[in-house]
């Protein structure tokens, strides 16, 4: 089982994924991605879904037109783990392919 990150580890790990923030009231991280249009947003979600499935770690997300809101947490661990940070980093890399920093 993956271990939950302690507060200090969590804060340090978040420095490596700019744009992600801790969610108030729960142990999770979140980011909002804004793309040029719906096609790019959906393309991002498709690519991110393939990475998530490969790693057996799935996001909570919501898409409205060109915006994708993502929340990551590891339910089995009861909070944020390295898996969340790694998926956040992978999503950032995918977003950069669409010109979103």
Curated annotation (Swiss-Prot):
Q: Report if keyword Magnesium is assigned.
A: no
Q: Which GO molecular function annotations are given, in alphabetical order?
A: 4-alpha-hydroxytetrahydrobiopterin dehydratase activity
| InterPro entries, alphabetized | PCD_sf, Pterin_deHydtase
- UniProtKB keywords: Lyase
Q: Mind telling me which Pfam families this protein's record contains? A: Pterin_4a (PF01329)
Instruction: Write out the catalysed reaction.
Output: (4aS,6R)-4a-hydroxy-L-erythro-5,6,7,8-tetrahydrobiopterin = (6R)-L-erythro-6,7-dihydrobiopterin + H2O
Q: Which domain of life is it from?
A: Bacteria
Q: What EC number(s) would the UniProt record show?
A: 4.2.1.96
GO biological process terms, alphabetically, are: tetrahydrobiopterin biosynthetic process
**Enzyme superclass (EC):** lyase
Q: Which NCBIfam families match?
A: PRK00823.1-2, PRK00823.1-3
Membership in a protein family? Belongs to the pterin-4-alpha-carbinolamine dehydratase family.
PANTHER family, from UniProt? PTERIN-4-ALPHA-CARBINOLAMINE DEHYDRATASE (PTHR12599:SF0)
Q: What is this protein called?
A: Putative pterin-4-alpha-carbinolamine dehydratase
Q: Which organism is it from?
A: Rhodopseudomonas palustris (strain BisB5)
């Amino acid at each position: 089982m993956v271990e939950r990150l302690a507060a200090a580890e969590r804060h340090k790990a978040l420095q490596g994924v700019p744009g992600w923030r801790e969610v108030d009231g729960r142990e999770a991280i979140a980011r909002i991605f804004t793309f040029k249009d719906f096609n790019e947003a959906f393309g991002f979600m498709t690519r991110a879904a393939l990475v998530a499935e490969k790693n057996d770690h799935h996001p909570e997300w919501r898409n409205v037109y060109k915006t994708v809101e993502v929340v990551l947490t590891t339910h089995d661990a009861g909070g944020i783990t390295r898996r969340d940070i790694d998926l956040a980093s992978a999503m950032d890399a995918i977003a950069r392919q669409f010109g979103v920093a």
